[in-house]
Curated annotation (Swiss-Prot):
Annotated organism of origin: Hemachatus haemachatus (Rinkhals)
Family: Belongs to the venom Kunitz-type family.
Pfam families, per the entry: Kunitz_BPTI
Gene Ontology molecular function, alphabetical: serine-type endopeptidase inhibitor activity
Gene Ontology CC terms, in alphabetical order: extracellular space
Alphabetized CDD domains for the sequence: Kunitz_textilinin-like
Free-text tissue specificity from the UniProt record: Expressed by the venom gland.
Official protein name in the record: Kunitz-type serine protease inhibitor 2
Amino acid sequence: RPDFCELPAETGLCKAYIRSFHYNLAAQQCLQFIYGGCGGNANRFKTIDECRRTCVG
């Protein structure tokens, strides 16, 4: 899996409410979080399937 899958979920600096998914290293699965719309990091996916393909598979 790519190194960015190990980064923590980051909401970012903006105040939007965008349902997103990230890989949670401790839980070893993709989990939902709310993204603010700007900033953050690469451990952010639009769908849980995209997260799983990238970080779990």
